A protein has these predicted regions:
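Bacterial Sec-dependent N-terminal signal peptides
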Residues: 1-22
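Carbohydrate-active catalytic/glycan-binding domains of CAZyme proteins
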Residues: 20-318
Length: 318
């Protein structure tokens, strides 16, 4: 019994950290693909990022009461022994859904040739976990098998039906001419399985703004969907490249996840930042978070966001 207690204490210390940093300014949080989870019950914000640690640790959390300063909250996920996908752990998006917290995250196994895909974790004990895998080992991913996918995000429609939006990567085996794609997939209520077939929504080249200096349209990153309460518009933000990493938006013409989606011709943000998400803060203000610059070290960026006539207005960093 004594050995078990010692082992448990060691695990807790490795997760929280005896030297946890506190009062870290947002401008000092190094993080790609930042996703802010709002805990309205306790008046807190959480950020979970990819960070490799001891004993299979892969995801690390911060918490804040004001979006200006953050405290380290420790590791919130450790891979089970023998887990098939130890690589990447990109874009951990964390949602409160049906009374529990779920994390959609992109993983792979490069050595064994397992292509990237999105898997789903769940915490039964609040936003700081511990998170556990809920997709069985024989499937690993919630994204389609045999496709190189990433950046799965959750959207729950007006009927309470969960959907996942995700990217099919430009360098995978399922795309044409190295042009990335965005798809959607209806999920079951438990978020551990799918309903029906996935639907391809668009290719990078369908968006007039997503043109690199060479003229090519390649990358589709981070599709994130937001319903505008006033207009009813279903708006998708996603990231690609102009001359630098940028963000654009598209509107569903039916108000449904399956679209069709029409792209705004003007870029939303073109100052070398992206992989965005939208949230309302504890006061109800509309905010956007993303990483900027796109090169290391990428920094957590949070700023105000405005909507006019059912579309997001261009973003400017102060």
């Amino acid at each position: 019994m004594k050995n078990k207690i010692v082992a448990l204490l060691a695990l807790l210390l490795s997760s929280v950290g005896v030297d946890a940093q506190t009062h870290i300014p947002t401008s000092k949080i190094v993080c790609r693909d930042p996703f802010i989870t709002v805990d309205r019950e306790h008046g807190l914000y959480y950020l979970i990022k990819s960070k490799y640690g001891p004993d299979g640790a892969r995801l690390f959390a911060y918490k804040s009461s004001d979006l200006e300063f953050w405290d380290e909250a420790g590791y919130v996920y450790h891979m089970p022994e023998g887990y098939k996908c130890p690589d990447d752990w990109w874009a951990p998006d964390t949602y409160f859904y049906n009374g529990k917290y779920y994390c959609f995250v992109t993983v792979s196994n490069q050595a064994k040739g397992i292509m990237r895909g999105t898997t789903v974790l769940r915490s039964d004990n609040g936003p700081l976990g511990p998170y556990r895998n809920i997709i069985p080992d024989d499937r690993i991913f919630i994204t389609p098998p045999g496709m190189q996918c990433l950046d799965g995000s959750l959207y729950v429609d007006d009927q309470g039906t969960p959907w996942m939006f995700f990217s099919v990567e430009w360098n995978g085996p399922n795309v044409v001419d190295s042009v990335g794609e965005v798809w959607c997939q209806q999920l079951n209520a438990e978020l551990d399985g799918t309903v029906g077939d996935p639907v391809k929504l668009f290719r990078t080249s369908d968006a007039p703004w997503a043109k690199e200096p060479s003229g090519k349209s390649i990358v589709t990153d981070a599709p994130f969907v937001w319903r505008d309460e006033k207009s009813g518009n279903l708006i998708m933000l996603w990231s690609s490249f102009t001359n630098v990493y940028s963000m654009g938006q598209a509107i569903s013409q039916t108000g449904k996840p399956t679209g069709p989606w029409v792209h705004e011709k003007d870029v939303l943000f073109s100052d070398n930042g992206g992989h965005q998400m939208v949230f309302r803060d504890l006061k109800g203000n509309l905010k956007i978070s993303f990483h900027s610059p796109n090169e290391n070290p990428s920094i957590l960026t949070i700023c105000d966001l405005k909507i006019k006539n059912g579309k997001f207005l261009p973003i400017k960093i102060k």
